[in-house]
């Protein structure tokens, strides 16, 4: 299954707000339903609940079905909680790191910067959005002038307290902002509201 490139509002109406996909907020149809309407709705199956959790994770991080399945398999082979390791793997992707630093408004925007070879990790150009960042990595945004003003405005409007503790943003060189990975992200710093166990259960027979 390929990466979704259609209307984003259609997705968040169905799956609720996904900060990585779009910064627009919308009240989901589930929340809009009145109490009487909710009582008449059919009982949602456990499969549908797990499927929705999986779809929320996939669309938020901009993954294909195959990519997400591969991440689940990697998480299963690692020591510790499979769900938390899965979230950690996704959060430490380069495209997501740029998003969490506040350099770009969404993960698709971060992917565009990376694909255009404007991002350096430890002084080396990285053009792979899925690149796995590690503690002590230094990420430099070396965008051309056409991007610099956009990035500067974005950073100025982004509250510093929104940057999670495992990351640090340095503006000592305004034209080349740098991000520092302090340590691996913990569960409390995950930006997406999700029950990762539902995703693990969904893939229990596939991974």
UniProtKB/Swiss-Prot annotation:
GO terms for biological process: ribosomal small subunit biogenesis; translation. Part of the 30S ribosomal subunit. Contacts protein S5. The interaction surface between S4 and S5 is involved in control of translational fidelity. Its main location: plastid. Keywords: Chloroplast, Plastid, Ribonucleoprotein, Ribosomal protein, RNA-binding, rRNA-binding. Gene3D superfamilies: Ribosomal Protein S4 Delta 41, Chain A, domain 1, RNA-binding S4 domain. SUPFAM superfamilies: Alpha-L RNA-binding motif. GO terms for molecular function: rRNA binding; structural constituent of ribosome. This is Small ribosomal subunit protein uS4c.
């Amino acid at each position: 299954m390929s990466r979704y490139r259609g209307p984003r509002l259609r997705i968040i109406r169905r799956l609720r707000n996904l900060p990585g996909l779009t910064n627009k907020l919308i009240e989901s149809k589930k929340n809009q339903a009145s109490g009487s309407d909710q009582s008449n709705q059919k009982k949602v199956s456990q499969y549908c609940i797990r499927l929705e959790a999986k779809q929320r994770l996939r669309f938020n991080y901009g993954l294909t079905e195959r990519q997400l399945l591969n991440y689940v398999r990697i998480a299963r082979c690692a020591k510790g909680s499979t769900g938390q390791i899965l979230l950690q793997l996704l959060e430490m992707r380069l495209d997501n790191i740029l998003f969490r630093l506040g350099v770009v408004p969404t993960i698709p925007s971060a992917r565009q910067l990376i694909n255009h070879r404007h991002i350096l990790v430890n002084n080396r150009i990285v053009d792979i959005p899925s690149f796995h960042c590690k503690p002590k990595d230094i990420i430099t945004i070396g965008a051309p002038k056409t991007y610099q003003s956009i990035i500067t405005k974005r950073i100025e409007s982004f509250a510093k307290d929104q940057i999670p503790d495992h990351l640090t943003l340095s503006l000592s060189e305004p034209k080349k902002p740098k991000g520092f990975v302090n340590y691996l992200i913990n569960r409390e710093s995950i930006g997406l509201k999700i029950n990762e166990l539902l995703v693990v259960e969904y893939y229990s027979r596939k991974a």
